């Protein structure tokens, strides 16, 4: 049996302001930093250790990983930073308040943009300053692979090459792997691992800063998964994530 631990970054400044964030590189709030430290404490108390970690190239995930490593005294851990673990790109919605957007376009439309599998939000213009083309962190990524918007289907297609070519081989080699990433890049990976249908994935909400443990068989198929921590508090956090895109 193998174990894989996933963690969504702690609360970010735009999580707190209820904005669509995507690839915009916002930082953690004080609460987000505390959530990351608490995640590290939970993992340490439960006896976990790691051989390698994966994260995105966005600071809210990177800093979450730092805090977890710090709490676990694993600052020396090898870390792979990959744009493939970035949050889903929210296109022209990036920076907009979710509730205000729902009030303008309707709860149903915003739910489709936030949670449907194959309907992306309106795209950015290529000349928009939020477009990734001139960002140095993506200088080595072929331009045609950089998105101006994404649906979850696109995010799955982006995440899976990293899983197949790097993460899965590390797990099979017996390494203890930690992934610190984002709500939708983790939803994409979970959809693949659990074989969740395109329709059912709409209802999957991942709370900030809570370790999610997957136990996998020899074929890397899930045996079971569970969150570490107070289960009632985790359920409340999941419900809060689900309500973010509603007008009232």
Swiss-Prot record:
InterPro entries (alphabetical): His_Pase_superF_clade-1, His_PPase_superfam, PG/BPGM_mutase_AS, Phosphogly_mut1
Record keyword Isomerase present: yes
GO biological process: gluconeogenesis; glycolytic process
CDD domains hit by this protein: HP_PGM_like
Residues the record lists as binding substrate: 8-15, 21-22, 60, 87-90, 98, 114-115, 183-184
GO-annotated molecular function: phosphoglycerate mutase activity
Pathway(s) where this gene product acts: Carbohydrate degradation; glycolysis; pyruvate from D-glyceraldehyde 3-phosphate: step 3/5
Keywords: Gluconeogenesis, Glycolysis, Isomerase
Record flagged with keyword Isomerase: yes
The protein's Enzyme Commission number: 5.4.2.11
UniProt catalytic activity: (2R)-2-phosphoglycerate = (2R)-3-phosphoglycerate
Highest taxon above the source species: Bacteria
Family: Belongs to the phosphoglycerate mutase family. BPG-dependent PGAM subfamily.
Subunit record text: Homodimer.
Descriptive protein name: 2,3-bisphosphoglycerate-dependent phosphoglycerate mutase
Lineage: Bacteria, Pseudomonadati, Pseudomonadota, Betaproteobacteria, Burkholderiales
């Amino acid at each position: 049996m193998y174990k894989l631990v996933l963690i969504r970054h702690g609360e970010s400044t735009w999580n707190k302001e209820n904005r669509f964030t995507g690839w915009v590189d916002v930082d953690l709030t004080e609460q987000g930093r505390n959530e990351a430290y608490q995640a590290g404490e939970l993992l340490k108390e439960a006896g976990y250790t790691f051989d390698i970690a994966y994260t995105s190239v966005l600071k809210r995930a990177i800093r979450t990983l730092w805090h977890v490593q710090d709490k676990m005294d694993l600052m020396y851990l090898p870390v792979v930073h990959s744009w493939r673990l970035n949050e889903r790109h929210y296109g022209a919605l990036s920076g907009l308040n979710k509730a205000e957007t729902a009030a303008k376009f309707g709860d149903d439309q915003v739910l489709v943009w936030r949670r449907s599998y194959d309907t992306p939000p309106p795209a950015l213009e290529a000349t928009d300053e939020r477009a990734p083309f001139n960002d140095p962190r993506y200088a080595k990524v072929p331009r045609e692979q950089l998105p101006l918007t994404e649906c979850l289907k696109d995010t799955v297609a982006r995440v899976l090459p990293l899983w197949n070519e790097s993460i899965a081989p590390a797990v099979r080699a017996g390494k203890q792997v930690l992934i610190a990433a984002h709500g939708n890049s983790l939803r994409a990976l979970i959809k693949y691992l659990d074989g969740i249908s395109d329709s059912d994935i709409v209802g999957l909400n991942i709370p900030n800063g809570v370790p999610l443990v997957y136990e996998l068989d020899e074929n890397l198929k899930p045996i079971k998964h569970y969150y570490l921590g107070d289960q009632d508090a985790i359920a409340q956090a999941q419900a809060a994530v689900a309500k973010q895109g509603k007008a009232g």
